[in-house]
Amino acid sequence: VTLSMNGTNNTLNVDQEGTAGNTVTHVSFWGSMSSYGGDINGNDNNVKIKQTITTGTDTNRVGFHIMSSDNNVDICQGGTFSSSSDTTCSDSGVAEYGGHTINLDLHSGNNDIRMGQETGSGNADHYAQIYTYGGENNDVFTKQSGNGNKNLYMTIRTDGGEQSLTQRGDGVHTATIDLKGSYHTDLSLT
């Protein structure tokens, strides 16, 4: 699915299931960016993306550039969340092993972002790259769980906000976090 979304108070739900190639993005992550207005542009939007592979061929990808404020974005690849007030992305079904990639670029404030990457079997990796620039009080909750390597790269260039990151079980764990801003940013890494 390749898309751009403009406007205020939109709701977008994408649910992808299958054995290969689940992708929600604009072309090559930073494709058009809708003339730099962002792939998602407009305030107060609710975006929910759920990707499930049922005995993998290693592809779950999500990539967006968001230029607007006060959005709720939930990205669930295979399963997880459980907290920053979960909106039920549990799962942990048998035989789910997609390779999970999230690339998210926020140039805005007051966004609530929840991301989950889980592999129930197999040895697929998890990769998340998150940037927040300009705008304040972005809250990000990320959980990577089970099998394969877990790589998380986060750059926070905003004031305030809470960042909660969890990497669990199996494989090598790497988290690179770069924080900069005038006011506090709460960070929890487990």
Q: Can you describe what each PLM-predicted range is?
A:
Residues 1-190:
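Low-complexity repeat regions of mature extracellularly deployed or surface/particle-associated proteins
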